[in-house]
Each structure stands twice: as C-alpha cells, then as structure tokens.
C-alpha cells in the first residue's frame, strides 16, 4: 500500500493532536506534533528569560536557536510520543498555561518558523506521516495528499482545554482560558509569517459537537478515500 502525507491544521485546542495521534497509531504512520516544537522553543525562552517587559529578546533567541534540539520518543507504556528538549522530557511542561499564553508570539517569529519548518520537512521526506499544526497543509507540506482543517467554537475549545488541565491536577480558570484561546486565534490569523488559514484543497471538519469516536471514524474514512483515490 502506498504511503501518503497527512496534514491536519486548525485552531488551538480543537483536538487536532488527539485526532492525529489516534490516526497515526491506527494506520501505522509516524506522528509529528509541530505545535509541541513551538511550545518547546517557548519553554526554552521562558527558562532563559527571553521574555522581557519590552517583549521577546529576539536577538538572544535567534542566537540560541542552534542550541535548541527537539526530538520525539515513544512512551513504551502509553504508546504516545513524548517531546524532548535537549534530551529532557518536557511533554507535561510544554502543556502548561504559562507556555500556552506565550507560544503564539514565538510562533509568529519568522526565523523560528523557518528553522522548525526545515526540521519538519526533513522528518516527513519518506512520507507515511501525520503532522498537525497551523501551516502544515499551506507551508510545510503543500503537496500533502490529505489535508484536513479543523475548527470548533472558541467556547467549546476553552472548555476542552479547561477539562484537560483539571484532569492533570492543574489549576485552571475557564475565563482566562477562553481569553487565551481568543487571543491565540487573533495572533494566529493575523501574523505576517504563515498565518492560519484553510488550504484551498483541505477538507473542513467542524468538530464542535462530535465525539472522539465520531471524529476518528470520519478521519479514517477520509484516509481510505485518499489512499484509494
């Protein structure tokens, strides 16, 4: 069976990663979480004090980029990928609200996107991958055989994020999360470099009122159609 590239783009907290991980595991493809890569750079920037009262110290971050090494390893117990930053497991750390509230301005930096897009394209050369993010179908893999664009209402996405954080035992405020979701939408859609948009040949999925099982069935059907097409 031929292997293809699957690009899943969409808004923050709309379940892209869960969909992509489940699909990759089911069809035996490699899953690459592009959002985790931007979160890892954000975490590094927070740890190094690159966020100042005047904004991001872009020169310091640009100088540090060659020292930022991001990799993914499979958790043998959960069979889920874990994100490593310079050989340290940061899978939980990059999902914090602090990182969430700082990631969009980092992702809007041209030199950061350029460096990470190159890494992502290298990872996907052999096909047989599922990658989710904001610009996978438009910039990273414009020739992907299957492109999905996922959306859901901001209120529902905020509730999902709130539930996720609470399930991990983290303190969370629904109002602050909703504010963060709406702000990230604004930044993602209006940034100069690779703004969030639906590729012309992407299939739209509004999963506001769909269960995970319904999304999985829908996505599997689209994969089968792409393989047989």
Curated annotation (Swiss-Prot):
Pfam families: Cytidylate_kin
Localization annotation: Cytoplasm
Keyword tags: ATP-binding, Cytoplasm, Kinase, Nucleotide-binding, Transferase
HAMAP family (UniProt xref): Cytidyl_kinase_type1
InterPro entries to which the protein is assigned, alphabetical: Cytidylate_kin, Cytidylate_kinase_dom, P-loop_NTPase
GO molecular function: ATP binding; CMP kinase activity; dCMP kinase activity
Protein name: Cytidylate kinase
Signal peptide: none
KW Nucleotide-binding (keyword) present: yes
Catalytic activity entry: CMP + ATP = CDP + ADP; dCMP + ATP = dCDP + ADP
EC number of this enzyme: 2.7.4.25
Family per record: Belongs to the cytidylate kinase family. Type 1 subfamily.
Binding site for ATP: 10-18
Major localisation: cytoplasm
Gene Ontology biological process terms from the UniProt entry: nucleobase-containing small molecule interconversion; pyrimidine nucleotide metabolic process
EC top class, as a word: transferase
Gene Ontology CC terms, in alphabetical order: cytosol
